[in-house]
Amino acid sequence: MSEILLLLHPTVVTEESLVESAKSGLSGKFPEASLTQHIIDRIANDMVELPSSHFDHIHYVNPNKSHLSIPPSVMAKLFASLKNGGELSGDLPKDQDLDVLMNGFIVKDDGSWSKPAPVSTVLLRKKKPAETAARKMPTFKKPVSSPVTLTDTSANNTDAEDDLSMKRKLDSTKLAYFSDDSSGEEDDLIDENELIADSHKFNVNIVVPKKCELPNGKKRKKACKDCTCGLKELEEQEEQATRNLQDTLLGKMAQSATLEAIKIEERLKKSQVQFSAQDLTEIDFTVEGKTGGCSSCALGDAFRCDGCPYLGLPPFKPGEVVTLDSFGEDI
């Protein structure tokens, strides 16, 4: 009896029809199988421990098509729970081929993942060279010592010819010896291309790196310290654009404030109040016969207004010059 694991995304719990449809499909495909059901979050948080090499097939149901990614740690747990040759199918991500391969899975043409069965290694034995006749050791001609005799210098030098022939024999012997060894070494060489099957050649899935952005309009994370995906440069451009906008707004505000201050100053200059000598003498108590607006400034603090400039001074007579020296005796 085969073991089947139905792996559910947390959002599937609210859709019972989708779960029942997945169960009926697995029952039709594996009629005599034992079905086990788990939620992927419980496996990711180690709340559920899957048995090792136990399931023949795992089916993953995830209705959230915009977020199908599976953490690499969960991939490793699912790989360990599958039997050799088992498959993982369902709503699987299409942009995590590198993580899938790193965890041991093989991506099939239909998009499912399979756990390959272990392959027994075959040792290639060293090919021995064909045995030939036993090689003889090289012989060397030992010159025979002879008594020194008088020779005719006009005759040919036979000793030089003998040395030359011996040297040629030695060279031919060395070449024969090393040529036999090199033939054996050539037999040991194995072409690497012959070890690769034709079906595996040029079958490479190009993995495109994911963009640094989240679906459903979620807030993007900050760039890493050693960011190489371009997110750091993008953030710097956004910050620079924000600074430029702020500088522009502040410049406009300062310019408008300056213009407004100039307008107010011009308005004040136009509406400046000018007092005549007659107006000024109306409140000058040094002039005889003049009194203040309240006509009681000379009577004392009890009769003076709140803003009277003579608050705190003793009563005086109208027309009298008020000085501090005149009150020195009272202090």
From Swiss-Prot:
UniProt keyword annotation of Mitochondrion present: yes
Region spans: Fe-S binding site B: 294-308
Pfam family, one: CIAPIN1
GO cellular component, one term: mitochondrial intermembrane space
Cx2C motif 2, short sequence motif: residues: 305-308
Subunit structure: Monomer. Interacts with TAH18. Interacts with MIA40.
Protein name (database record): Fe-S cluster assembly protein DRE2
Source species: Clavispora lusitaniae (strain ATCC 42720) (Yeast)
